[in-house]
Amino acid sequence: MPHKVSLSRLKLTDFRNYAAASLSLDGRHAVLTGDNGAGKTNLMEAVSLLSPGRGLRRAAYGDITRVGAAGGFSIFAALDGMEGEVEIGTGIEAGEETTARRLRINGTPAKTADELTDHLRLLWLIPAMDGLFTGASSDRRRFLDRLVLSLDPAHGRRASDFERAMRSRNKLLDDGRFDPSWLAGIEEQMASLGIAMALARQEMLGLLTRLTEETLESSPFPSASLQLSGFMDGQFSRPSVDLEDDYRVMLAESRYRDAGAGRTLEGPHRTDLVVHHREKAMEAARCSTGEQKALLVGLVLAHARLVGNLTGHAPILLLDEIAAHLDENRRAALFDIIDGLGGQAFMTGTDRGMFTALGDRAQFFTVADGRVFG
């Protein structure tokens, strides 16, 4: 069983609809129930900001600050983390105009948000993701990269560095500055970073596929078969140095075409995640809404198990409205799977009765009007 990473305290100040909120947690799962709009998802969002990035809503930090507050917000968490007990604080200060939040770990300013992955890994599933299989490829790419990031914390930095290099190349091409040596230097960087990104994605999908195949018969949820398309399809069994050479040549040969298009037309930023319902041999986008939700739940749970197996530490799960639209038997099976992962899960719903099958495996909180009652 993986080590259980769990929050013991969560304190919010001027966060969304909370002027101040404090939760004392005992390591069990946390179930948050209350009316729609009470602030359940806001609590989940606060926990999600204990990972790199902008959290489960990807909101601008100015939008997170409570309306009517002086400005700024803060999140404090104490947890039993991957390296022992740790305290994490993050937020922005009043009057601070920034796209980056401040972060302290045990009172010491962190150099980068990537340091958070030394202490916990977070995965989430929210209603906004229900249209993942039918929506834009950029949403699936973002989902894919969060899966990779849970196993390879350097992936996020590679992706942002690639985007930065690509923007530089696009600007040079847009300005008509076709300096061969300058472009070659940028394209070499893009090739190195881009292939590393693509290989990390491919490796994660391979690991997840093998795990899924091993647990086919025991899961109450349909299993997904996963493929990548849109960039160097079918070539990733070749040596990385050869792939980098090919992509570098591809970029050099497409300069005029990319200049005309106003963007880079080939690269890992064009990759799409193709998902099929394994048992039905059907593309996920063609499945019913209920089947798509079940596929997504199964995929996230399988990935959570993979993270626990490979890191030795169970991820914290944020599952918003997870029990809605599931019958009683499937809800009970879902809770057993979540508990069997060995980690702590935060779950929300409007009806406490939907979580009865959890019994004493969970702490129950009621959320109402920006207040939390334990």
From Swiss-Prot:
InterPro entries: AAA+_ATPase (IPR003593), DNA-binding_RecF (IPR001238), DNA-binding_RecF_CS (IPR018078), P-loop_NTPase (IPR027417), RecF/RecN/SMC_N (IPR003395), RecF_2 (IPR042174)
CDD domains assigned: ABC_RecF
GO molecular function, one term: ATP hydrolysis activity
Secretion signal, residue range per the UniProt entry: none
SUPFAM superfamilies: P-loop containing nucleoside triphosphate hydrolases (SSF52540)
Family according to the record: Belongs to the RecF family.
Role played: The RecF protein is involved in DNA metabolism; it is required for DNA replication and normal SOS inducibility. RecF binds preferentially to single-stranded, linear DNA. It also seems to bind ATP.
Protein name: DNA replication and repair protein RecF
